[in-house]
Amino acid sequence: MEAIINKLYEQQSLTQEESQQLFDIIIRGELDPILMASALTALKIKGETPDEIAGAAKALLANANPFPRPDYDFADIVGTGGDGHNTINISTTAAFVAAACGLKVAKHGNRSVSSKSGSSDLLDSFGINLAMSAEDTRKAVDDIGVAFLFAPQYHGGVRHAMPVRQTMKTRTIFNILGPLINPARPNIELMGVYSEELVRPIAETMLQMGMKRAAVVHGSGLDEVAIHGTTTVAEIKDGKITEYTLTPEDFGLESHPLEAIKGGDPEENKAIITNILTGKGTDAQLGAVAVNVALLMRLFGHEDLKANTQQAIEAMNSGKAYQLVQQLAAHA
């Protein structure tokens, strides 16, 4: 371990195997906190490579509690959080809409990073059981088409890094690992990142982790596909990465200002999301969710973004998406 940490002190990048060894020891609680802080700082200052991120993610997945993985195509739709904009819970809402459009979604989530209400806070308010067993969660994906895996239930080892992360008060590699360590191991993923600089490296990381089809996005300051500006995309298909940009017009929608999709506390968000999922939200709110669902649908082979967007809006207007919230709450 000394050799690995010394390599970081010399600003040398680790191999994927070395990174996996380092994070394996961190997750097992076997690395001295001072050394852990040094290693995380050295990685941050050097800039984490796709190899290092993939190695860390593999270590966390190897140490995670097991989940009975479906053998069909299924996805995660998730953002890193930490974009600082406190928007409504777009990816959580989009998960229900995507399921209403016939996709299978197993969403990995945690308490909030930057918004006043993270995905788990919102789900809690709808009466959805976050402590659902892995078997029940899997059954929900099978039967309802959507379920949520609450990170602390599967990744207990992350607690060993918590005191160091809280003391450091800065972003570390852990801030980007969450979306990469879904214990259900989806083969399709739409992942939003808080910085445009991360789009390509995270796509390269996903490629190394064997993702079948995925897109990494940053939307004009947001860790989502944007309704207020352009979105930078790195898409994985057939083992290759293609980079492109999207605008609201590509989805057949007008753009709306960022203020139009601001969120609130969990209770306010619950009211907003209920309106969206029953088609009573504003055009901006429905559009913000629909563009994310539309890109996720593309990853399942439905290439026409405009048609996908209309299908997503219809799933909200019909109330079908909200019915899935009620079914998931009853499932527990």
UniProtKB/Swiss-Prot annotation:
Pathway: Amino-acid biosynthesis; L-tryptophan biosynthesis; L-tryptophan from chorismate: step 2/5. Its EC number is 2.4.2.18. It comes from the Bacteria. One of its GO terms (molecular function) is anthranilate phosphoribosyltransferase activity. GO terms for cellular component: cytosol. Pfam families: Glycos_trans_3N (PF02885), Glycos_transf_3 (PF00591). Anthranilate 2 binds at R165. Mg(2+) 2 binds at D223, E224. Keywords: Amino-acid biosynthesis, Aromatic amino acid biosynthesis, Glycosyltransferase, Magnesium, Metal-binding, Transferase, Tryptophan biosynthesis. Binds 2 magnesium ions per monomer. It catalyses: N-(5-phospho-beta-D-ribosyl)anthranilate + diphosphate = 5-phospho-alpha-D-ribose 1-diphosphate + anthranilate. 5-phospho-alpha-D-ribose 1-diphosphate binds at residues 79, 82-83, 87, 89-92, 107-115, 119. Its cofactor is Mg(2+). InterPro entries: Anthranilate_Pribosyl_Tfrase, Glycosyl_Trfase_fam3, Glycosyl_Trfase_fam3_N_dom, Glycosyl_Trfase_fam3_N_dom_sf, Nuc_phospho_transferase. It is an enzyme of class 2 (transferase). The keyword Oxidoreductase does not apply. Mg(2+) 1 binds at S91, E224. Anthranilate 1 binds at G79, N110. GO terms for biological process: L-tryptophan biosynthetic process. PANTHER family: ANTHRANILATE PHOSPHORIBOSYLTRANSFERASE (PTHR43285:SF2). Catalyzes the transfer of the phosphoribosyl group of 5-phosphorylribose-1-pyrophosphate (PRPP) to anthranilate to yield N-(5'-phosphoribosyl)-anthranilate (PRA). Homodimer. This is Anthranilate phosphoribosyltransferase. It comes from Vibrio parahaemolyticus serotype O3:K6 (strain RIMD 2210633).
